[in-house]
Amino acid sequence: IKVCSPISAQAILESGWGESRLAKDYHNYFGLKCGTKWQGKSVNLATWEEYEAGTAMVISDYFRIFDNMEEGVKGYFELLQLPRYQNLKGITEPGRYLETIWADGYATSSVYVQKNMELIEQYQLMKYDENASGRSAQDVLNVMRSWIGYSEANGKFRQIIDLYNSYLPLARGYAVQYTDF
């Protein structure tokens, strides 16, 4: 992987800054579904899907369970080894990475690329792309740890929640409240 910012943005968006039930209880920070080849543990949860642009619906689907954060991040990189994601190799531009992974079927939201790019720009995540050639799952894990668990005391709390709630349809169908933390 030659670009880390879109991966960090995906984790932020998919996990609600590491605070979603899927992230907190099951260490699945990327919203990874089981698919047909998954042999590990799983949990059935409600989720939003957008099969027709602009029309979201709630479905129930099986998501992967990981034992810890490290395994959850490694799970993302293992998913990228599937043949359908091989076209991501060598991409150095965040927008192109996101457009490609979206077109490959990673997400159904018609605004998925836009939401992730807004996170990349607002939080200057491209600084993690410098010299990203050869980055590992551990590098992305280190970035994620620095973003997970914001609290009201650090001044980003309300800004993060407001940004998260501004994206429709809401991930997992839930608008985060300031009092949730």
What are these regions (language model features)?
Residues 131-181:
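N-terminal capping segments
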